[in-house]
Design a protein with these regions (language model features):
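N-terminal alpha-helical interaction modules that lie
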Residues: 1-68, 113, 117-181
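Alpha-helical protein-protein interaction scaffolds
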Residues: 36-110
């Protein structure tokens, strides 16, 4: 369900324990809780100073997930599947490309704000870097190339070109960053 962000609704909702919760049991955090933390963070002094904490960064969770996978590798228990079909059965139906549970929560929170197809349905992000994190995980950059980026009225438009030369636009609402500074 798409629900545009009313930032004032999230004032005071950022919970500093969210990092620990995401680390220990990401399944205990739902999309609305992630929205509260993501958009509630924009009311903190740290956000006003330009900081984004690890727990709200998809890049952080990607690196953390890779570290955890390396720490838990056990080649003795590794079994090669009998066929490709068994591999495909285990794949998530998620529209996101190879993401950790924490990254998926952030993506779902952003996706719940719009579809990014028009300025009116722009995806709400808390800074420009989060746009690029989103694009890397939702759109395979090997397929699309960033052609142009423009900002008007707090809406950032990324124009991406595919192999056939078609241009696709993705709109992000970054107005909160401009409001806060």
């Amino acid at each position: 369900m798409m629900k545009k962000v009313n930032y004032s609704e999230y004032e005071g909702k950022y919970d500093e324990s969210i990092k620990e919760r995401l680390e220990k049991d990401p399944g205990s955090v739902n999309v609305e809780t992630m929205r509260e933390n993501l958009y509630g963070y924009t009311y903190t002094k740290e956000y006003a100073d330009g900081g984004i904490p690890d727990e709200l960064s998809m890049d952080y969770w990607e690196e953390r997930h890779e570290e955890m996978e390396l720490d838990n590798l056990n080649f003795e228990d590794f079994e090669m599947p009998d066929n490709l079909d068994s591999l495909l059965e285990d794949m998530d139906d998620s529209p996101y490309f190879d993401v950790s549970p924490q990254e998926k929560l952030i993506l779902e929170a952003i996706d719940s704000t719009g579809d990014g197809k028009t300025p009116e349905t722009a995806l709400c992000v808390i800074d420009v870097h989060q746009e690029h994190e989103y694009i890397q995980r939702v759109v395979r950059l090997s397929v699309l190339q960033l052609v142009r980026q423009s900002v008007a009225g707090g809406i950032d438009c990324l124009e991406l070109r595919d192999y056939d030369g078609r241009i696709e636009k993705v709109y992000f609402d970054i107005s909160r960053r401009f409001e806060v500074g």
